[in-house]
Design a protein with these regions (language model features):
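The feature captures the beta-strand-to-loop junction immediately N-terminal to the Walker
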Residues: 41-43
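Conserved ABC ATPase signature
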Residues: 123-127, 131
């Protein structure tokens, strides 16, 4: 594994309901390297998105610890299932507004990498779902993230569009490699994108199996 950037140890995580506490996560121990893509694969409702929210510091109500390995919390780029683009801004403006300091050259490079250059002046309402998702991926990269959180970014896309979007995501990642946690139901998708896969069980969720993806499938990870 590359230099580790985070270690997440969860003892338990529950949600409060009218009927009492609902256990969601059991004992989980996840480590992530600086240039590593780790996929979280499991059934609906098993807490995959909750894990991402904990790593993204959006949910701090759990028993356990999130350790950034001696460093400050990194810059995190997040891609949700819904693109959440600003509808009154163009594609390019959505990227520029996300940046800490406007960097038009980086924005344009990402639009090219994700096959969106021809749509830089388009508004989100004119885009297909697949294109809007790619804009969201470009926006996540535009902050120069040290960690990407990808919450089923290709769900509901037709197979051809999903395959093309995965290819373009890897193109962008190879140009700016960073750590990433990917949530997906699709084991084939996980094997294409990740170099480790964590198979999650039913609630209260634990890691059932860790699968190392052969480097021949991910030559970009080879030294």
């Amino acid at each position: 594994m590359a230099e580790m950037i985070l270690r997440l140890r969860i003892e338990s995580k529950s949600f409060s309901t009218d009927r009492g506490e609902l256990p969601v996560l059991g004992r989980i121990d996840i480590a992530l390297g600086a240039r590593e893509i780790v996929a979280l694969v499991g059934p609906s409702g098993c807490g995959k998105t909750t894990l991402l929210r904990i790593v993204g510091n959006l949910d701090t109500d759990f028993q356990g610890a999130l350790d950034w390995c001696g460093a400050a919390m990194p810059r995190i780029g997040t891609v949700f299932q819904e693109p959440r683009l600003l509808p009154w801004r163009t594609v390019r403006q959505n990227l520029l507004l996300a940046q800490r300091t406007e960097d038009p050259e980086l924005a344009d490079a990402l639009l090219r990498a994700l096959d969106l250059a021809a749509f830089s002046d388009a508004f989100p309402s004119t885009l297909s779902l697949g294109m809007a998702r790619r804009v969201a991926i470009a926006r996540a990269f535009t902050i120069d993230p040290q960690l990407l959180l990808l919450d089923e970014p290709f769900v509901s896309l037709d197979p051809a569009m999903a395959a093309r979007s995965r290819e373009l995501l890897l193109n962008a990642w190879r140009a700016r490699p960073t750590a990433a946690l990917l949530v997906t139901h699709d084991r084939a998708e996980a094997a294409e994108l990740a170099d480790r896969i964590l198979l999650l069980g039913e609630r209260p969720t634990q890691v059932l199996q860790e699968i190392i993806v052969p480097q021949v499938r991910r030559p970009d990870l080879m030294p």
